[in-house]
Amino acid sequence: MGKKTFREWQYFKLSITSFDQDVDDAHAIDQMTWRQWLNNALKRSYGIFGEGVEYSFLHVDDKLAYIRVNHADKDTFSSSISTYISTDELVGSPLTVSILQESSSLRLLEVTDDDRLWLKKVMEEEEQDCKCI
């Protein structure tokens, strides 16, 4: 029998937009805005269970975010962000998030050359975490 691999994390590459180029150009999206949007989406879709979804930011670059989600919560996370459109309270216009990529392997995340530095650091941290288990 083959060795079964335990997957603790699911990785997401996300994009946020208002679908209004003027609004998108006028507002930089920081990690706090991303977090507020994601928390609102999870709460709206799943109530207190959605608020309990474990996720963390690997990297935020304005309209792109790389997120790590507990593997057990990946379906809850992806369905809540795929169906949620925010109110205009965050940037003055409703925002929506698209999943650009989803992977159970950090190594398979598609990043630009500029992103290789933070990705390498995150991969090293995860390797250290695996050695501790």
From Swiss-Prot:
Q: Name one GO molecular function term.
A: ribonuclease P activity
Q: Which Pfam families match?
A: Pop8
Question: What reaction(s) does this enzyme catalyze?
Answer: Endonucleolytic cleavage of RNA, removing 5'-extranucleotides from tRNA precursor
Q: Report which residue ranges the record marks as coiled coil.
A: none
Q: What enzyme category does the UniProt record give?
A: hydrolase
Identify the GO cellular component terms for this protein: cytosol; nucleolar ribonuclease P complex; nucleus; ribonuclease MRP complex
EC number of the protein: 3.1.26.5
UniProt keyword terms in alphabetical order: Hydrolase, Nucleus, rRNA processing, tRNA processing
InterPro entries according to UniProt = Pop8, Pop8-like_dom
Q: Name one GO biological process term.
A: intronic box C/D snoRNA processing
Function of this protein?
Component of ribonuclease P, a protein complex that generates mature tRNA molecules by cleaving their 5'-ends. Also a component of RNase MRP, which cleaves pre-rRNA sequences.
Other observations noted = Present with 4870 molecules/cell in log phase SD medium.
Oligomer and partners: Component of nuclear RNase P and RNase MRP complexes. RNase P consists of an RNA moiety and at least 9 protein subunits including POP1, POP3, POP4, POP5, POP6, POP7, POP8, RPP1 and RPR2. RNase MRP complex consists of an RNA moiety and at least 10 protein subunits including POP1, POP3, POP4, POP5, POP6, POP7, POP8, RMP1, RPP1 and SNM1, many of which are shared with the RNase P complex.
Protein's name according to its UniProt entry: Ribonucleases P/MRP protein subunit POP8
Give the organism, scientific name: Saccharomyces cerevisiae (strain ATCC 204508 / S288c) (Baker's yeast)
Q: What is the lineage of its organism?
A: Eukaryota, Fungi, Dikarya, Ascomycota, Saccharomycotina
Its gene is POP8
